[in-house]
A protein has these predicted regions:
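Hydrophobic transmembrane alpha-helices of multi-pass, membrane-embedded glycosylation machinery
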Residues: 39-43, 52-61, 232-238
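Membrane-interface alpha helices of multi-pass inner-membrane proteins
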Residues: 21-22, 32-52, 212-220
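Hydrophobic/aromatic-rich transmembrane helices and adjacent perimembrane loops
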Residues: 225-244
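Short, small-residue-biased leader/transition segments that mark boundaries at the very start
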Residues: 2-7
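Hydrophobic alpha-helical membrane-interfacial segments at the cytosolic entry of transmembrane helices
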Residues: 69-101, 122-129
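Membrane-interface transmembrane helices that cradle and orient dolichyl/undecaprenyl
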Residues: 20-33, 59-66, 238, 242-243
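Aromatic/glycine/proline-enriched transmembrane-helix motif characteristic
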Residues: 133-218
Length: 244
């Protein structure tokens, strides 16, 4: 068990290294490299999709549309940048997904289709709202309130986290579906990207990544306690600018 946790921690450390490389590319004004690195990061672990709105808005405003095109040449240049950015983003996806797509085209049955198997493993909605190693977030308070209401109603107390893959069932309060979690996280992300849209910069990108990571930790689905690293580690890159 300890060896398994050690391997997992090293893997997560490697992923944060790729995240920091993408932020370094943004800091050194290399938007295409930034896009390619972040697209590769999404292929390595899809949990980073929570911070994708920050990258999308930054690359859109800092590279594709630094200003509104007002002439034919400016429009042509914007289209050229869009094509380059699209290629830098899509190539990592194609390199990793295309072999599976070709294999799935030869096998259309759901039981053995590799794309269907990937989907069920990447998005395990059956695992429930709270992880066994639950995060101290909004849903922890929600589950605590559910337990209090159950005690007040003198009902049998149900478990809100049954092992690593157990489902979460509330007793008094309504159950929370995955769509609600994603809608809340996306709504918060849309608020956080507004300053980045108005004035795209490296510092604002890092702050936006931090806030999006915090949103995923606070209201995400099946959040592990270590998911706080998605907010805490990027924050370290700009913390000295605000407190020193």
């Amino acid at each position: 068990r300890q060896r398994q946790m050690c391997i997992r921690d090293r893997y997560n450390g490697f992923l944060f290294g790729v995240l920091f490389l993408s932020l370094w590319a943004a800091r050194t004004h290399r938007p295409l490299l930034c896009a390619a690195l972040f697209a590769s990061l999404l292929q390595l672990k899809h949990i980073y999709i929570y911070v994708a709105p920050a990258y999308f808005v930054y690359l859109l405003r800092a590279y594709m549309l630094p200003s509104l095109p007002t002439s034919a040449s400016a429009v042509s240049a914007a289209i050229d940048r869009t094509i380059k950015l699209g290629a830098a983003t899509l190539v990592p996806f194609l390199l990793s997904i295309l072999p599976f797509v070709l294999d799935a085209m030869r096998d259309v049955s759901y039981e053995t289709n590799v794309l269907y198997a990937m989907y069920t493993r990447l998005f395990p909605f059956h695992r429930g709202l709270m992880h066994a190693y639950w995060a101290p977030n909004v849903w922890a308070l929600y589950a605590a309130a559910d337990r209090v209401l159950l005690r007040l109603q003198h009902q049998t107390l149900a478990s809100t986290s049954r092992g690593l893959v157990g489902d979460t069932v509330m007793g008094a309060l309504p159950n929370v579906p995955p769509s609600t979690c994603f809608a809340l996280a996306l709504s918060l992300a849309l608020v956080y990207v507004v300053p980045l849209w108005r004035k795209p910069s490296y510092t604002r990108l890092v702050v936006c990544v931090t806030l999006c990571g915090m949103a995923s930790f606070g209201v995400g689905w099946h959040v592990h306690e270590k998911a706080i690293l998605l907010a805490a580690l990027p924050l370290g890159l700009v913390a000295h600018r605000r407190y020193v």
